[in-house]
From Swiss-Prot:
Keyword set includes Lyase: no
This protein's record includes keyword Coiled coil: yes
Stored InterPro entries: Cactin_C, Cactin_central
GO biological process: cellular response to interleukin-1; cellular response to lipopolysaccharide; cellular response to tumor necrosis factor; innate immune response; mRNA splicing, via spliceosome; negative regulation of canonical NF-kappaB signal transduction; negative regulation of interferon-beta production; negative regulation of interleukin-8 production
UniProt-recorded name of the protein: Splicing factor Cactin
Organism expressing this protein natively: Mus musculus (Mouse)
Stretches with biased composition (Basic and acidic residues): 78-88, 177-200
Region (Disordered): 1-164, 177-202, 499-550
Chain positions of cross-link Glycyl lysine isopeptide (Lys-Gly) (interchain with G-Cter in SUMO2): K491, K506
Pfam families assigned: Cactin_mid, CactinC_cactus
Coiled-coil regions listed in the entry: 157-207, 247-299
Ranges of Polar residues composition bias in the record: 103-112
Family the UniProt entry places it in: Belongs to the CACTIN family.
């Protein structure tokens, strides 16, 4: 029983415990539910509160917006009132210029009160004045107080501009307030952050930070400083200086003063540095100017030396061409002008005789060469070259006129008819330079005077011919003076008494004292008058004749030719006509037609046999010249070999072979020349090959082929010596050539052969092509 009771008690206790546990669980659940309900209630309350707050904010914003609108309306009304008031004031000021009317104080007050009632509050504030007798009297007494219209207009414009600025400021402020009222929290946060950053930037600029440090913050900087934006205070240094007791504000002021002093000191240092740099730049500029002047002087001497060098080279080329028998007209003229400076060289012919037989192309080349010599000589012998230019141009005009004479009657008339030209030449011929100059001045005066019947073409053509005759006369007189000087020097050196070089023409006194009137150039027709300026010639002719009679009258070249022709006619050099009885018995008489037939037969026989005047050497040179292009020139500079002994010298007389060599020159268009030159300004020509033609017609051993040997040049590695050896009876001959590698391919023009007594060695140099 006891066990059963115990068991029942245990069961009841376990039941009570489980019931208690269930109750506790239910109570905890109810408590959680109540808590969640309270939380939801609090959330709903907070939501309602936030809604009410947002509703209050929106209502507040609406009220503020309505207030701003009301303020705008009021400001517009005030602005309109002020504008009306200003109009009234301007009217009153314009009326104030008139004399004021006297009225009583009551009337003025009444009018003032009426105007105040009409103008509203702005008038009630006392911003307008009323006229009174006293005020008008005072204005009459002191006219300086009355404002002028210009001053009133200026004051009005200033007031309007001030009001406009105030209005703009007010509108800007209202817009900012409106934006602030309607901005979101994010925009507000961004605005405040931007304002803070601008403030920080201004602070950093004031602290002297550069642009590269502007983006640093306490959390983002390469120095790892969490207090970067704060002011660093060095307490130890302050204690050492004894200023640790100062407050932060005083320390900031002290640091600011120190920074200002440092800034001023830096400015001074920077100013001094800039001044030093400026002085240094000025010194460098002065030194550069001095250096330029020195270089200009140095280069000036170089230019002079270069011109003299080119002149020497041109004269040397002329000498070489004269020596080789291929002289150009400019070479002969250069030799003539250089012979004047030489003490012993004598040139018997006038320089313009070198133009005989030249074509138009040759004369044009001569003009270009004359210009080159004039530039190189720099003013020396300028009169000689100018006269030669005039004569050459006249000869070119004559040749072109002859070439154009067969083109028909459509040609333009050249001013002087062919029938009159011979008479003009006879008038100008034989006269001195002074006489021709007088005629030239007379023709110029006639052209300047003009006239209705003056043939300008005739007189201008005559003037052109006269210039050429004057140039010839001047060169002829210069030639005679040079001959006299050379003869005098030769006689002084040889100790011979002075005698005239040519026969003296003794002028008759009758001719000297009774001068005939000078011949006038024939006029082109009845419409043109003869030359008038003959009287000055007649006046000066006696004096000139006397001067010529006193000195030596030298025969000209034309006079010598005329004298020889006269001697020929007087001496009867032609066969004398014989009669039939004067002929010998065995004489065979031929009729003229028989003689002509025999002559023609002889000519035909001679033509069938070939050219009788062409020798073996001429044939050789003709063959050697075949295929000679524009890029090739004759090369005849021989290299002396010194005294060489030959074993066959006692049997055969050694002799040098004849040769005709050519050098091939051209432009090398490498990368450098392509960069710095073009076809208008080409680079200097270089030697690209040689063609040697050695003539061995009389070799003893016909089967022995001539040989060539290439030897190094001892004095210059850039050149080599090419020696030719053939055997008796010819000596070895050598030439100095450029030392470069040869092209031995026949496709590049290489030839080495001996045929018909001519040894030919043709070769070109290799072209180096540089590739990366």
């Amino acid at each position: 029983m006891r066990g059963a009771g115990r068991q029942m008690g245990r069961d009841s206790r376990s039941r009570s415990r489980s019931v208690g546990r269930r109750g506790r669980k239910q109570r905890s659940r109810s408590r959680g539910r109540s808590r969640s309900r309270s939380r939801s209630r609090s959330r709903s309350r907070s939501r309602s509160r936030s809604r009410s707050r947002s509703h209050g904010r929106s209502s507040r914003r609406r009220r503020e917006h309505e207030r701003r609108r009301e303020r705008k309306r009021r400001s517009r009304g005030r602005r309109s009132d002020s504008e009306g008031e200003q109009r009234q004031k301007s009217r009153r000021r314009s009326q104030s210029l008139r004399p004021p009317r006297w009225h009583s104080q009551n009337q003025s007050s009444c009018s003032d009160s009426g105007e105040e009632r009409a103008q509203g509050s702005w008038a009630r504030k006392g911003h307008r004045r009323s006229w009174s007798p006293g005020s008008s009297a005072s204005s009459l007494d002191s006219p300086r107080r009355s404002r002028s219209p210009g001053t009133a207009t200026l004051a009005l414009s200033q007031q309007q501009s001030l009001q406009e600025r105030l209005r703009l400021r007010e509108e800007r402020k209202q817009q900012e307030e409106l934006l602030k009222a309607f901005e979101t929290p994010e925009e507000k946060r961004a605005r405040r952050l931007a304002k803070k950053e601008a403030k920080e930037r201004k602070k950093r600029e004031k602290m002297g930070w550069g642009e590269e440090y502007m983006g640093y913050t306490n959390t983002d900087n390469p120095f790892g400083d969490n207090n970067l934006l704060g002011t660093f205070i060095w307490n130890k240094a302050l204690e050492k200086k004894g200023i640790s007791h100062l407050e932060e504000k005083e320390l900031k002021e002290r640091n600011k003063r120190i920074q200002e002093d440092n800034r001023l000191e830096l400015q001074k240092v920077k100013q001094l540095r800039l001044e030093r740099e400026r002085e240094k730049a000025m010194r460098e500029q002065e030194l550069e100017l001095l250096q330029r002047e020195k270089e200009a002087e140095h280069f000036k001497t170089w230019e002079e030396q270069e011109d003299s060098f080119h002149l020497r080279q041109a004269k040397l080329r002329s000498k070489i061409r004269i020596r080789d028998g291929r002289a150009k007209p400019i070479d002969l003229l250069a030799k003539y002008i250089s012979a004047e400076d030489d003490d012993l060289a004598v040139e018997m012919h006038e320089p313009y005789t070198f133009l005989n037989g030249l074509t138009v192309a040759d004369m044009e080349d001569l003009l270009e060469d004359i210009q080159v010599y004039m530039e190189l000589e720099q003013g020396k012998n300028v009169d000689f070259w100018r006269d030669m230019t005039t004569i050459t141009e006249d000869e070119i005009a004559k040749l072109r006129k002859l070439e154009a004479s067969g083109k028909g009657p459509g040609e333009r008339r050249e001013g002087v008819n062919a029938s009159v030209s011979s008479d003009v030449q006879s008038v100008f011929k034989g006269k001195t330079y002074n006489q021709l100059q007088v005629i030239f001045q007379g023709i110029e005066g006639k052209i300047r005077a003009g006239g209705p019947n003056l043939d300008m073409g005739y007189w201008e053509s005559l003037l052109q011919q006269l210039r050429a005759h004057m140039a010839r006369a001047r060169l002829r007189e210069r030639h005679q003076d040079v001959l006299r000087q050379k003869l005098f020097k030769l006689k002084q050196e040889q100790g011979v008494e002075s005698e005239p070089l040519f026969p003296i023409l003794k002028s008759e006194p009758s001719a000297a004292h009774s001068p005939e009137p000078e011949e006038r150039p024939p006029s082109p027709g009845t419409s043109v008058d003869p030359v008038e300026p003959v009287e000055p010639e007649e006046a000066t002719a006696p004096g000139e004749a006397e001067g010529e009679a006193e000195g030596e009258a030298v025969l000209m070249e034309e006079d010598l030719i005329q004298q020889s022709l006269a001697d020929y006619d007087a001496g009867r050099y032609s066969p004398r006509l014989l009669t039939a009885h004067e002929l010998p018995l065995d004489a065979h008489v031929l009729e003229p037609h028989e003689d002509l037939q025999r002559l023609q037969l002889s000519r035909q026989q001679l033509q069938a046999t070939g050219d009788a005047s062409e020798s073996a050497e001429d044939i050789f040179f003709r063959r050697a010249r075949e295929g000679m292009g524009q890029d090739e020139a004759q090369f005849s500079v021989e290299m002396p070999l010194g005294g060489r002994a030959y074993l066959w010298a006692d049997k055969y007389r050694p002799r040098k072979p004849r040769f005709f060599n050519r050098v091939h020159t051209g432009f090398e268009w490498n990368k450098y020349n392509q960069t710095h030159y073009d076809f208008d300004n080409p680079p200097p020509k270089i030697v690209q090959g040689y063609k040697f033609n050695i003539f061995y017609p009389d070799l003893i051993r016909k089967r022995a082929t001539p040989e060539y040997f290439l030897e190094a040049c001892a004095d210059n590695r850039d050149f080599a010596i090419l020696r030719f050896h053939a055997g008796p009876p010819y000596e070895d001959i050598a030439f100095k050539i450029v030392s470069r590698e040869w092209e031995y391919s026949h496709r590049h023009g290489f030839r080495c052969q001996f045929a018909n007594g001519i040894f030919q060695l043709w070769f070109h140099f290799k072209r180096y092509r540089y590739r990366r």
